[in-house]
């Protein structure tokens, strides 16, 4: 009896193998796209309009959200940009580790100038950097990029005091005052979502306006049509950038 059971089990196993689908090793698969090695050149940058770059960043962010990031040969791009750079956009963003501009906009080496400070506000140093990026290096678009649940804004709402952080958070006093005036919100609760989100958005708008007011170099480029300044807020949960009107 044991012999017959053993023969039956062997036959059953053999039948199962015969009916099993072909392994992945033999299945046909679509060829994987070659990684991008090319970088922006001076001629390519010069041909870009602010509107075209804006659309490219929107499309790149959507690829990021969809999990369809472009494959890139970063070693090749690093070598290709060693002698010069011709970025398409300059991003003024927050230092938050969860908001890397090159990744969330699906851009490669040499595509973006990036200046970062907690709370993505402008100061003399960052204005000078943006003037270099635009007037000297030819970048046609400036992006002011905030993000949800910004720790700097939360700290300002809570009135945090800590070393040099205290002076930095003072940059948001006018933003918070305007938000509370508009929304008639008197709370100082750092977890008050309405205050925090409104302040994040207002801070982006104010930074955009301050860049134009404080830099004649940049404002003249905007007036001539060679440059645009846009702003958006990145959602930490979804990865999507919501663009704002100035």
Task: Place the predicted regions along the sequence by residue.
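Bacterial N-terminal signal peptides that target proteins for export
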Residues: 1-8
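C-terminal motif of bacterial Sec signal peptides marking the signal peptidase cleavage site
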Residues: 15-18
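Divalent-metal-activated hydrolytic enzyme cores
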Residues: 20-84, 109-110, 119-137, 154-246
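Short glycine-enriched loops at secondary-structure junctions
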Residues: 93-98, 118-121, 147
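Acidic/His- and Gly-rich active-site-bordering loop/insert found
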Residues: 101
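Short helix-loop-beta junction
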Residues: 104-114
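Conserved functional hotspot residues or short segments at active or partner-binding sites
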Residues: 144
């Amino acid at each position: 009896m044991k012999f017959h059971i053993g023969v039956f089990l062997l036959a059953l196993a053999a039948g199962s193998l015969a009916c099993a689908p072909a392994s992945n090793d033999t299945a046909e698969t679509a060829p994987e796209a070659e990684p991008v090695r090319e970088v922006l050149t001076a001629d390519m940058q010069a041909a870009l309009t602010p509107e075209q770059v804006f659309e490219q960043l929107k499309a790149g962010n959507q690829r990021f959200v969809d999990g369809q990031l472009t494959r890139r040969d970063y070693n090749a791009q690093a070598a290709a940009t060693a002698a010069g750079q011709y970025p398409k956009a300059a991003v003024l963003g927050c230092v938050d580790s969860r908001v890397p501009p090159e990744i969330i906009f699906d851009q490669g080496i040499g595509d973006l100038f990036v200046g970062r400070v907690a709370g993505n506000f402008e100061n003399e140093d960052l204005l000078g950097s943006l003037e270099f990026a635009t007037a000297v290096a030819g970048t046609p678009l400036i992006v002011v990029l905030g993000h949800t649940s910004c720790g700097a804004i939360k700290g300002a709402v809570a009135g945090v005091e800590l070393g040099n952080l205290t002076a930095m958070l003072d940059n948001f006093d006018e933003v918070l005052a305007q938000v509370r005036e508009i929304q008639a919100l008197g709370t100082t609760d750092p977890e008050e979502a309405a205050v925090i989100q409104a302040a994040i958005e207002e801070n982006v708008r104010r930074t955009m306006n301050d860049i134009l007011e404080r830099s004649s170099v940049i404002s003249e480029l905007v007036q001539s049509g060679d440059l645009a300044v846009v702003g958006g807020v990145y959602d930490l949960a979804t990865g999507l950038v919501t663009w704002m009107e100035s």
